[in-house]
Amino acid sequence: MKKMIFLIAALFMLAAFAPTQAQTFYDMELGGSVQCTHQFRDRGFVNVGTDLRATLPVSEWSRLRALVGVNGFVPNGFDRYGYGMVGITAEALPFYVFGDFGLSCNPSGSHTIGLAFDAGVGLAFAITDRWRLYSELAIDRINSGKLWQSTSSVKAGAMYRL
């Protein structure tokens, strides 16, 4: 299963370097999503959160976009986690793959600073010349002090091209 995921991700990365004829996503985009997150160690918990992001094209001749954003969610009703992220998105529209990393913080618990990693696949549909809707499936690894947490997320959101 892991080999299949890596193979699909590699194909999207190769498609990202193909020259584009019409850069419909050449401008900066701003957007956000609502997410449902499940912690692997706490079976049965389904958590909610938000994701705010901006993307910029890396070059005129590739489908790579730089990703900067903030992700936050409530994993168990008591603690809140958030992390800033910097990453890359490879688009072969309507599909794309992404990966990012950043610093995490637990503002309601131990106030620890840790690391966060996020990777996944997404599907985006243009609804106007400036708006597009997207949905993502992601795997997150978040360090909250001494403990690494693994979560899976399903996100649905919208992006606006400036």
Where are these regions (language model features)?
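A mid-sequence interfacial segment
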Residues: 102-134
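Residues that define the transmembrane beta-barrel architecture of outer-membrane proteins
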Residues: 26-28, 42-50, 78-84, 105, ...
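Outer-membrane beta-barrel "beta-signal"
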Residues: 125, 149-162
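Membrane-embedded beta-strand positions of outer-membrane beta-barrel proteins
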Residues: 28-34, 66-70, 86, 97-101, ...
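Repeated loop/turn-to-beta-strand initiation elements of outer-membrane beta-barrel proteins
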Residues: 58-66, 94-97, 125-133
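Short glycine/proline- and aromatic-enriched beta-strand/turn motifs that initiate or cap beta-hairpins
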Residues: 21-73, 155-161
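Transmembrane beta-strands of outer-membrane beta-barrel pores
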Residues: 34-40, 56, 70-76, 90-94, ...
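Cleavable N-terminal export/targeting peptides
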Residues: 1-27
